[in-house]
């Protein structure tokens, strides 16, 4: 089972998109709110500004942990996220469309 955490102020809006995505992949998963005590396989982290990236320094992770960022269309933030070795950057107002676009890529990462 894949352990997934969503860190977002918009949890209620994003959660169904993530659930639908993993249900479509037919992968057994457990999606929870982020807590400092757990290590997850995948983190979805929503950011709004550069300071929000500090959360990445506090994530408990393994070498195989995937980190997906959900954020604004801001090329400086995208660049910083890539330097921080995150695995994908989703534009927040295009999230559903980007899940479809990256379906095969994410499936291979998992």
PLM regions with names:
Residues 17-21, 58, 80, 98:
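Charge-rich, solvent-exposed alpha-helical interaction surfaces
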Residues 73-88:
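Alpha4 helix (beta4-alpha4-beta5 surface) of REC/receiver domains from two-component response regulators
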Residues 19-22, 26, 79, 103, ...:
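Residue-level detector of alpha-helical secondary structure
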Residues 91-92:
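A Lys-centered signature of the CheY-like receiver
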Residues 1-30:
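Short, charged N-terminal beta->alpha structural module
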Residues 25, 62-63, 84:
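Helix C-cap/helix->beta junction micro-motif
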Residues 85, 96-110:
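Receiver (REC) domain switch/output surface
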Residues 15, 35-66, 71-77:
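Conserved phosphotransfer microenvironments
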């Amino acid at each position: 089972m894949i352990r997934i955490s969503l860190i977002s102020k918009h949890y209620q809006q994003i959660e169904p998109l993530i659930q639908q995505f993993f249900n479509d992949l037919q992968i057994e998963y457990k999606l929870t709110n982020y807590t400092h005590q757990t290590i997850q396989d995948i983190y979805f982290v929503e950011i709004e500004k550069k300071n929000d990236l500090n959360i990445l320094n506090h994530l408990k992770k393994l070498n195989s942990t995937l980190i997906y960022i959900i954020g604004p269309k801001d090329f400086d933030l995208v660049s910083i996220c890539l330097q921080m070795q995150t695995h994908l950057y989703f534009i927040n107002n295009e999230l559903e469309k980007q899940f479809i676009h990256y379906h095969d890529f994410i499936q291979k990462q998992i």
